[in-house]
Amino acid sequence: MPELERAPKLDQALAEVAAEMAERTDRGDVATYIPQLGKVDPRKFGIAAVTNDGRVLVAGDADQAFSIQSISKVFTLTLALGNVGDALWQRVGREPSGNPFNSIVQLEHENGIPRNPFINAGAIVISDILLAGHQPREAIGEILRFIQFLADDDTIIIDREVAASERATGYRNFALANYMKSFGNLHHAPELALGVYFHHCAIAMSCRQLAMAGRFLANGGKNPATGHSVVSAERARRIGAMMLTCGHYDGSGDFAFRVGIPGKSGVGGGILGIVPGVASLAVWSPGLNANGNSKLGSIALEKLARMMNWSIFAP
């Protein structure tokens, strides 16, 4: 992975990418199955980078909060691994699904064990793990405080309207939870696990805040500003591996091919990207492609990675 000698050009690269994205008209379609997300202006675009030497660089609408949705699953996985360790992998797999993120088909064939922690079923199991010994409100608070701690920003909130919108329309997620409960892979009532799930998906963050929160994954598990160890270096690598192979649902292979870094997307249009040893990246453009990933966000990260010669596959 290239070192930071190229990073002085990073602010220029971000500005160039943001300017190019502003000119594009093929922006994808905003998610409408969660009604609150359908109200977001598709013309928005923001991008941020936080380097391991402490610089915070932004362009476009990088300080406007958006619903991080499935990007939150990176942080809930981190918390759950801290709570139960590798026992977590007895209840959720580590393989790409090859199916839509809310598919119920594989659960039937695989006895209620979700393929990975980033598809909806897997994230519901992670929420169930975080419920152990807690009321839903306590588990939700723990997740929010953890993300605030990582970002060093206690202004990050949960958008209650988005959470309510998800609960009111989340019939497929209720089906997934009940199906896993029937296999014994939920230890709490489905509605409790789903309450945690809907609320952590409704966390609102800006690109700047999100890139700050992801710093530890780019720095061997440590907060580069304080040296505080969030996770071990090995666990940071493994979370990064999950992001690379499963972070974009059934578009994960294409993202790895085109961009070449670990990333996690959300249907709110955000993507968290990790350049190990260099920087944490966040991009937001609400319009989605056919796989439910940010269309311009993916294009922007591909362009940025090419400009900066970033890839985990580079010598």
From Swiss-Prot:
- Set out the biological process GO terms recorded for this chain's protein: glutamate biosynthetic process; glutamine catabolic process
Enzyme Commission number(s): 3.5.1.2
Pfam families hit by this protein: Glutaminase (PF04960)
**Residues that coordinate or bind substrate:** S70, N120, E166, N173, Y197, Y249, V267
What span is annotated as the signal peptide, if there is one? Answer: none
Domain of life, per UniProt, equals Bacteria
Name the cystine pairs. none
What family classification does the UniProt entry report for this protein?
Belongs to the glutaminase family.
Q: By its UniProt entry, which HAMAP family does this protein fall under?
A: Glutaminase (MF_00313)
Which proteins does it associate with, and in what oligomeric form?
A: Homotetramer.
Q: What is this protein called?
A: Glutaminase
According to its UniProt entry, this protein's organism is: Mesorhizobium japonicum (strain LMG 29417 / CECT 9101 / MAFF 303099) (Mesorhizobium loti (strain MAFF 303099))
